[in-house]
From Swiss-Prot:
Highest taxon of the lineage: Bacteria
Source organism of this protein record: Helicobacter acinonychis (strain Sheeba)
Name of the protein in its database record: Ribosome maturation factor RimM
Gene field: rimM
UniProt keyword Ribosomal protein present: no
Family per record: Belongs to the RimM family.
Subcellular location: Cytoplasm
SUPFAM superfamilies cross-referenced by the UniProt entry: PRC-barrel domain, Translation proteins
Amino acid sequence: MLLVGRIGKSVGLNGGLKLHLESDFPECLKKGVKVSVAPLNAFSHASFKDYVIHSYEHAKNLLFLETINTPEMARELTNLGLFMSETESKKLCVLKEGEFFYCDLIGLSVVEENEILGKVIEIQRISHIDYFMVETTLNLVEKGLAKIFLIPYRDFYIKEILLQDKKITTNNAKTLLENS
């Protein structure tokens, strides 16, 4: 399941929910789309409860789910995560050239000048900038470098993403690692 957003407070008398969007693709939030709600740290599918989107107002970040129609029902979902299946996300979200689903980037090797620095284990958004969290290769850790480091998803650091080769080529990322 892919995190779409975090559910905030209840809004209005009809079960509206403030949605703090975590996705770059709000167009996926369409009437009739199946989503799931669960705690943000949910690991079990039993934790997920399925809903269907009634409507989403992007300008107000206001989400309405078909079976949630009172403020009391909406409050029960406050502080939970809104998720969508990877299959559903890929079906609904059309990517442009050079755009990627972050779930496809997890596990890719990070390579600079033919040296593998590590692999992407997570992607974090900090103050509107996305960062690749990279687990450093064992041989570099044994040389005293950090076990984990962050690479900003910016052209200065990211040279090329090659999904078919399962790697991300970088510039200046080794300097980040050495200074971590």
